[in-house]
Amino acid sequence: MENYCILGNPNVGKTSLFNALTGSYEYIGNWSGVTVEKKVGKLKENVGQLIDLPGTYDLSPISKDETVVTDYLLNDSFSGIINIVDASQLKRNMQLTVQLLELNQPIYIGLNMIDVATKRGIKIDYHKLMKKLKTPIFPVVARTGKGTKHLLGEIKHLGEGYQPHFKINYGEKIEETIKNMCQIIMTETSHDKYQARFIAIQFLLNNMQIANELNSEVVNKLSSLRDQVDKQVEAVSVRREMERIRNHYIETLLQDVVTYPDEDKQYFSSRIDKILTHKYIGMPIFLAIMWLIFQTTFTWIGTPLSDQLDAFIGGTFTDSVKTIMNYLGVIPFLQDLITDGIIAGVGSVLVFVPQIVVLFFFISLLEDSGYMARIAVLMDRIMESFGLSGKSFIPMIIGFGCNVPSIMAARSIENEKERLTTILIAPFMSCSARLPVYALFVGIFFKENQSLVVLSLYVLGIIMAFLVSTVLTKTILKNDNAIFIVELPTYRVPSIKTLWRSTWEKAKGFVRKAGTFIFGGSVVIWLLSYVGPHGINVNINQSFLHMVGSFFGMLVQPLGFGTWQAGATLVPGFLAKEVIVSSMAIIYSSGDAGLVNVIQNQFTPLSAYAFMIFILLYIPCVSTVAAIRKETYSWKWTALAVVYPLVTAYVLTFIFYQIGHLFV
């Protein structure tokens, strides 16, 4: 099967094009740093495989995710490259395009965001550009799919009759050095003359990953040649001279290809940015937007729908299943397992799907509109005080959906200590798995202020992440503040198709989790409540679950929720935070009173909020722990990521409850 890779700058629509060409769905967002690892999809019409590589401005990697690109181009086998560029930022995008052309591999250029360029009054004669580069160019609008069908039909012809032809003349002295380097590379390695020239150029540009691919003897020889030509060029260094020549080439190339308008048509966008990123009013606007989202999720739309679903699952559906099982003569043990274990456990989580869908819809809307990137800029000013940059806030925002991709997104951070700090604090972000716990308790104890209470938990998670990062960056992970540079994407009206796909995929993942982790956890919890030291079908107060819960309940007694039932729910919470709710449903369904009534009797508003604080901050779920181990390559950091949140959760919850208990 033929392999093709898709490359481009961050936030030019690579993943949108990947989805359009493969029919799959990968997470997309109107901001940079969404793709942090290689993703593979099967092209439609069985054309081959498409590899989506992380966005990069240059083939000299400065962050962990960018090393994936250079490593793939040097070491993997592929039939051709699809370089997607932003038509509204063509000059800047051509920096990477030129480097890819210097590979002298079959390449197509996808001219994306033609619609954005047109709205700005930018005119591009892509036919003329195609003739100049001798490379096929396809205008597309990846987010709507316009032009992608034509591109898909042509991909199978990529490379047919291809002849290497691209070459920039870097001047006599540098070209002589490149020639000498090529001879060394071809003699000492298996690279052909085109690969050798590419390697030589990248070596002169101080691409350290290229140097790492070569043996020390070759590196020493090439370094000697680079040092010699460094002294010969008039510029500060050979790298600066080559960059100057390359920039001149691009300017000449685009001179009669791109026509810009006389006046700036982004004036309105700039005015909005001055308000949304204002150092005084920007943050209140963000908090107001988040309050509005939570108000819609928990009061206006989400909760009423969840109540209807809860009534259906707990009533009509459960009664129907019982009737069918009685008719079929299913043994009592299985009947109890299915109704009191599986339906009660999984159903108690599924009832929150409407709220999850509403929340995901609005988060996707903020992402696709371009607003989230502005929040990263806004937070950069604040995060400097805590030893981080705005680039760390991007993974943190992703953590509102799930902590696992947020930890992986930290690859885009160049500074290794800042990357590690971000990984360690990311689990404090309120992921969707915690949302059912919040929804259950705020619906019982804080009906009049549900949105404010949930917002306070999200804000608390961010504050605790900042405080911990301050400690880490001043002690074991001390580092200099990094400069945060981010490209603010164009504001755009969110695509209904994109919003639907994004919301659907996230909700589907939540439901899929209910069918795996939560299903398994519910079965185990029910069995532990069914079996005890004295046999099976015992009273729950004599079960193994009661024994485990009593031990942990004793430990959390000072936190305000020291019942054995609450203690028993904390252990499976390590598997997945949603299992906490399913465990409660199973444990409390063993009695005659309903879940809501029992929780009202065992918790107070104070202890309920304390419980939510503990759930917010304590041990990350097993998937998150696995992601931390994968990204840090260290059991030491992984152990720290498990232990310190538990200690933090215990101490903060203790302080909150004990002080609150003095006044309530």
Swiss-Prot record:
Domain FeoB-type G, by residue range, is 1-161
Q: Where are the transmembrane segments?
A: 281-301, 342-362, 382-402, 425-445, 452-472, 516-536, 544-564, 567-587, 608-628, 637-657
- Where GTP 2 binds, per the record, is at 33-37
**Primary site of residence:** membrane
Binding positions for GTP 1 per the UniProt entry: 8-15
Which top-rank group of organisms is this from? Bacteria
The subcellular location is: Cell membrane
Family in the record: Belongs to the TRAFAC class TrmE-Era-EngA-EngB-Septin-like GTPase superfamily. FeoB GTPase (TC 9.A.8) family.
Name of the protein this chain belongs to: Fe(2+) transporter FeoB
> Which species?
Staphylococcus aureus (strain MSSA476)
